[in-house]
Amino acid sequence: MFALLSCIGISQTYVPDDNFEQRLIDLGYDIGPLDDNVPTTNINGVIDLDVDGLGILDLTGIEAFSALETFTCQSNNLTSLDLTQNTSLTQLFCGNNQLSNLDITQNPNLIILWCDFNQITSLDVTQNPSLISLRCENNLLTNLDVIQNPSLNVLVCENNQIASLDVSQNNTLSRFQCGNNLLSNLNLSNNPSLTFFTCENNQITSLDVSINTQLINLNCAFNELTELDISNNSNVTQLDCSNNNLCRLNLRNGNNGNITAMDFRANPDLNCVVVDNPSGNHSTWEPVSFSNYIASQNDCSNFVNVDTLDNVVTNISYTLPALINGNYFEQSGGNGIQYNTGDTITNSQTIYIYNETACDSNESSFSILIIEDDYYIPKYFTPNNDGRHDFWQVFDSNNSVKMTHIFDKYGKLLKSLTPNSQGWNGTFNGNPLNTDDYWYVVTLNSGEVIRGHFALKR
């Protein structure tokens, strides 16, 4: 048969793979039987060819499809693919094979390339300026240069070994998936059209999505982020930022009610989350048990536990007790000398208890007043419920006070205090009194009466 065709001048294309040739027979490009040859004139004008899932090992002969524009050869057993002669190719789908190399430098008209689920170690798309959709996920790529692909709309390159990726020239990118790589940073400032972005399982320490106002889906889980702010992303419906090192999470985008899936679990130092409405319904968000929702990041320090101690008045030294939350310091903010449990304080001073996490800090303070007299009468107090000077009382170190009476400037009795009482909180009949001077009459056990005045400051 071959000799006869040769005699009458019909050119043949060598197709050694029987599964490939059988597919061409089924499509009517050959009449059989299987003889490893197909008439070239039957295939050199074919525009669209689909040979998916046929167990093909060898696509020798594809070079004769010189007019081919769309080629689909997914889910075969290909280890190599030579398309250098198919210069009209615009769409190539060759995923789920065993390709280790793919040369598309001779296919300048490509607009779609899907080569996912192979073993490709290097992919050069710099000669494909019209590329709109690139899917190369689940390969062995260590780098990917898409700078020469300004029209790229879809880029899926997850599950590779890519350490850096520059998408600054891809300003029409709307879907970008780069999870499970080795990325430590990403710059999305030139991708304003981004709607679907996933970068989970990388090593990213910082992520700025303030310019990506069209974002709907964001997955940045399993990275090393310390803060994330989606206050400019009012279209977000799904966010997964779990398993990071978040200290700051700002979800106040004016549209929290539009969120259908939220997960910020496994951020152990995240004390609070900024939201639209702290008292709103967040019952579907993960973790369900989280409740520290606030309206401003400035409120976050309130969630760091720190021990508090009452002010101390003594005529002897004072020994610092053990703390659960925080450490003793000479100055505010964890500065100055650090004191330890059991240290003996012999002079009057204010001591600060400072506690910090990787994200936030909080502190309290108390005063130690060491007096030589039997009693001490404070000159002022500040009843504002901050834990400091909230009560006025006479400090009696030797049980010398019998009773204390407090009056306003008109002589009205406001409060009577026994020696062991907590003190006066600045109220009368449950109502807080104004900033002013108030008078005391202290009666000692000896019968001596001491009179004077002190200030209430609010």
What do the predicted segments below correspond to?
Residues 337-354, 422-423:
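Solvent-exposed segments in extracellular or luminal domains encompassing
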Residues 46-53, 175, 326-328, 346-359, ...:
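Append "Rare intracellular matches occur via the same short Y/T/C beta-strand/loop motifs
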Residues 301-330, 398:
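Solvent-exposed, low-complexity, repeat-rich "mucin-like" stalks and linkers
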Residues 47-49, 71-73, 90-94, 113-115, ...:
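Conserved hydrophobic beta-strand positions in leucine-rich repeat
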Residues 59-62, 81, 102, 123, ...:
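Canonical leucine-rich repeat
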Residues 372-458:
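Short loop/turn motifs at secondary-structure boundaries
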Residues 54, 76, 97, 118, ...:
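Consensus "Asn ladder" position of solenoid repeat domains
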Residues 7-70, 87, 106-108, 127, ...:
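N-terminal capping/linker segments that flank leucine-rich repeat
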